[in-house]
From Swiss-Prot:
Belongs to the RuvB family. It comes from the Bacteria. This is Holliday junction branch migration complex subunit RuvB. Its EC number is 3.6.4.-. Residues 255-338 are annotated as: Head domain (RuvB-H). GO terms for cellular component: cytoplasm; Holliday junction resolvase complex. Residues 1-181 are annotated as: Large ATPase domain (RuvB-L). The keyword Ligase does not apply. Mg(2+) binds at T66. The gene is ruvB.
Length: 338
């Protein structure tokens, strides 16, 4: 049971992605404030010979929440078990994981906001008292026993912290929001990844990829690999500025990182809904995309760069986006310039 919940089948691409992940805080680029805080918490926990307090990491996908969890386990010198909220279907699944933890181990739960509520309730005494309540038997003969657990650290990760229940969220002693990365930070990540993958790349090319990576390391590394493919097939394998620009144009990633679906979302709101406000379900239906995917993957970046606003009545495309897409701006029924 535990093996099914805790392991995945890794592809060669997954293995390559894993090799790019930093192992120590000193190697981790970006999120400076979080790194400084964690360094203090980790040192203090090690001095007291105690597990690190429970940690909640939240923010858009691809910013390094899982990577940061593995870095914390390395810095603490403890083991880590990785699972996700949807994978823990029953309370027995969680009980099996918790009882197999070693002293001071880290349990990392990705998408923790998707935990089943009955499973979540088992976590409360486990997080607070390192004890597990188990019901044995059914009906009138059922009885509850309490098992002692090894002291552990729970690291939860979520892209949607607002969907977590207050009782669960309040049990985390350390709560950190991961922010989008600067272009300069992404450039350094790309250069580091290129070095690990033995890819030749110049400064301007790394900067060009960084500009189109939506502030997200996962996207930066993905684009680097695809540009590498382009350089090997169309060039001599070395990534210069010209090669990077041509490859990214072929991939449909524009100068600020917008992709086909981003433009489709914005154009749909402008052409079909007068620029908004419009609900996420209507947007999803109009472009044939899942609403959760729009909210989790595409919308955060459009909000970040000021192309989209969220209002109580729905999503609204901003003047900035109209100008970028070269559409006449419509405000309160009036076309600007007319």
């Amino acid at each position: 049971m535990e093996e099914r919940i805790l392991t995945q089948n890794f592809t060669q691409e997954d293995a390559s992605e894993y090799s790019l992940r930093p192992r120590w805080l000193s190697e981790y680029i970006g999120q400076q404030k979080i790194k400084e805080e964690l360094k203090i918490y980790i040192e203090a926990a090690k001095m007291r010979k105690e597990p690190l307090d429970h940690v909640l990491l939240y923010g858009p996908p691809g910013l390094g929440k899982t990577t940061l969890a593995t870095v914390i386990s390395n810095e603490m010198g403890v083991g880590i078990k990785i699972t996700s909220g949807p994978a823990i279907e029953k309370s027995g699944d969680l009980a099996a994981i918790l009882t197999n933890l070693q002293e001071n181990d880290i349990l990392f739960i990705d998408e923790i906001h998707r935990l089943n509520r009955s499973v979540e309730e088992i976590l409360y005494p486990a997080m607070e008292d390192f004890e597990l309540d188990i019901v044995i038997g059914k009906g009138p003969s059922a009885r509850s026993i309490r098992l002692s657990l090894p002291r552990f650290t729970l690291i939860g990760a979520t892209t949607r912290a607002a969907l977590m229940t207050s009782p669960l969220r309040d049990r985390f002693g350390v709560i950190n929001r991961l922010d989008y990365y600067s272009v300069e930070e992404l450039k350094e990540i790309i250069k580091r990844s290129a070095n690990i993958l033995n890819i030749g790349i110049d400064e301007k090319a790394a900067l060009e990829i960084a500009k189109r990576s939506r502030g997200t390391p996962r996207i930066a590394n993905r684009l680097l690999k695809r540009v590498r493919d382009f350089a090997q097939v169309r060039g001599n394998g070395y990534i210069d500025f010209k090669t990077s620009k041509e490859a990214l144009d072929v991939l449909g990633v524009d100068e600020i990182g917008l992709e086909y679906i981003d433009r489709k979302i914005l154009v749909s709101i402008i052409e079909k809904f007068g620029g908004g406000p419009v609900g996420i379900d209507a947007i999803a239906a109009s472009i044939g995309e899942d609403g959760d995917t729009i909210e989790d993957v595409y919308e955060p970046y459009l909000l970040q760069i000021g192309f989209l606003n969220r209002t109580p009545r729905g999503r609204v495309v901003t003047k900035l986006a109209y100008d970028y897409l070269k559409y006449p701006y419509i405000e309160q029924g009036r076309i600007e310039g007319v």
